[in-house]
Amino acid sequence: MTKPAKKNMKSPGKAIKFLRFDWDKYYRIGRQERWRKPRGIDNAIRLELKGYQPKVKIGYRTDKQIRGLHPSGLRPILVKSVKDLEAFAKGKQDVIIIISSTIGLRKRIELIKKAEELGLKIANR
């Protein structure tokens, strides 16, 4: 199993939200949260001019070692039942539990009690 991320490891910092060109001018474009590559001949973002929003590049990607980890440095696991909890009880040092949003209150309380018994950490109590 992998070890939790070390404290001296480079943290991802604040993620840049890459917005589409002219997203603030048109409601139709502003609603779309998806990046599209600018293709215009004089487009300032495509030309990477100073003062304009950054263009998507591979250099913004997080390190492989910490990609997908919880901010605590633990690997998040989605849990929907007590059976799932027991499956991850063995490698509990490097795992943090996330209870599924579709779980009701009664089952959620049951999962929290079981996780505390097994000594597992829960991200969304």
From Swiss-Prot:
A cellular-component GO term for this protein: cytosolic large ribosomal subunit
Keyword Ribonucleoprotein: yes
Keywords noted in UniProt: Ribonucleoprotein, Ribosomal protein
Database matches in PROSITE patterns: RIBOSOMAL_L32E (PS00580)
An example Gene Ontology molecular-function term: structural constituent of ribosome
Gene Ontology process terms (BP): translation
Family note: Belongs to the eukaryotic ribosomal protein eL32 family.
Family annotation (HAMAP family): Ribosomal_eL32
Protein name (record): Large ribosomal subunit protein eL32
